[in-house]
Structure formats: structure tokens, C-alpha cells
């Protein structure tokens, strides 16, 4: 697979479309196994990325379900961009809050596509892998553009550290998670 942003087009190619439609059910049925394998693989190769993920959601499988759900929803609703806009906006906001950079999409794409082949084996032919690579990069390019607009609005650079903030509320969200309500200091903004 090419593993480069699909900036040359914004729609799924006619060769990829039937492959995606035919394989969505198989990938949905194996989505959690694929994404769990993906996270393990990516964190083994890039342990520095662990701090971007809620490890409680990793352990529970919520993160794996969220990633699988987002990619498959995108693949099945690509012809109705308005359907995916609210979810993509939420994902972009979350990514900006974490300082996600465009370069990190290459890492994610590489490990996600490799995980498809490693979990599903021979069922993932080169043509099917290329079709899913295309879907991934269409979604990634969309998210990168949304995130760029948010960064521009905030006058931040992608990956920029958060400004100093004031904690105005602290509450236990679960046994191992604390939720903080933050307030920007004068002259600063939050995503």
C-alpha cells in the first residue's frame, strides 16, 4: 500500500468501492481483534504514543471499539459526508486537545493496515489492503484538514503544548480516572 495521504482525490476510487463494500462485514466482525492488535503493535513500535491514549479505555476495549467504529462508519457513509461531519468534528476536537500532528497519521495508517493483514491473513489481498488504505487516507486527510482549521482558529501549531490553565473543578469520573474542568488564563484559548 502507498501509505501517503490521498490528497489527490476526495472520493473513494471506483476500483476500491466494491472491495470496501464486500469486506466491510468481515472487518466489522473482526474489528475489535484488528484494533486491539493494532494498538499492541503500534505501542510496541512507538511507546511514546501511549501518553496520547486513555489506558483505561485501552484495557476495557472502548478505544478499540471507537477506532473500528469510526473507520467502518466512514467507509459506509462516504457518499453522505454530512452524516459523518458531527463525529469527525468530535474526533478532530479530541485530536487537537491531544496535540495530534499530521505525521502521526502515517504511523497509525502503517500499523492499522499491517494489522489487517496480520489478523485476517490471506483474506486481505493486496487489492483489498490498497482499498482500505485509500479509505484510511481519505478519512485521515479529512481529519487533518478539520484539525488544521481548529489549530488556525486557536492560533496554535499542530502538536503545540497546551497553554497554562487553571483547574476550576476536579471530580472522580471512575475508580481510575479524574475529570478536570479547565479554564484558560487571560490571553489564552482552549480547544
Residue ranges of each PLM-predicted region?
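Short, Lys/Arg-enriched N-terminal segments with co-localized hydrophobic residues
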Residues: 1-10
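Globin-like tetrapyrrole-binding proteins
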Residues: 11-162, 167
Amino acid at each position: 500500500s502507498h501509505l501517503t495521504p490521498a490528497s489527490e482525490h476526495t472520493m473513494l476510487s471506483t476500483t476500491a468501492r466494491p472491495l470496501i463494500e464486500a469486506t466491510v462485514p468481515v472487518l466489522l466482525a473482526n474489528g475489535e481483534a484488528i484494533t486491539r492488535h493494532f494498538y499492541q503493535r503500534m505501542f510496541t513500535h512507538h511507546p511514546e504514543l501511549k501518553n496520547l491514549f486513555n489506558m483505561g479505555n485501552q484495557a476495557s476495549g472502548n478505544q478499540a471499539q471507537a477506532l473500528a467504529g469510526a473507520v467502518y462508519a466512514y467507509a459506509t457513509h462516504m457518499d453522505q459526508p454530512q452524516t459523518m461531519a458531527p463525529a469527525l468534528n468530535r474526533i478532530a476536537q479530541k485530536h487537537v486537545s491531544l496535540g495530534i500532528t499530521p505525521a502521526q497519521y502515517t504511523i497509525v495508517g502503517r500499523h492499522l493496515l499491517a494489522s489487517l493483514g496480520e489478523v485476517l491473513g490471506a483474506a486481505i489481498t493486496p487489492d483489498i489492503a490498497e482499498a482500505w488504505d485509500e479509505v484510511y487516507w481519505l478519512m485521515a486527510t479529512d481529519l487533518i484538514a478539520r484539525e488544521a482549521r481548529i489549530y488556525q482558529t486557536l492560533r496554535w501549531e499542530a502538536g503545540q503544548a497546551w497553554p497554562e490553565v487553571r483547574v476550576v473543578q476536579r471530580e472522580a469520573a471512575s475508580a481510575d480516572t479524574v475529570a478536570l474542568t479547565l479554564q484558560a488564563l487571560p490571553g489564552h484559548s482552549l480547544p
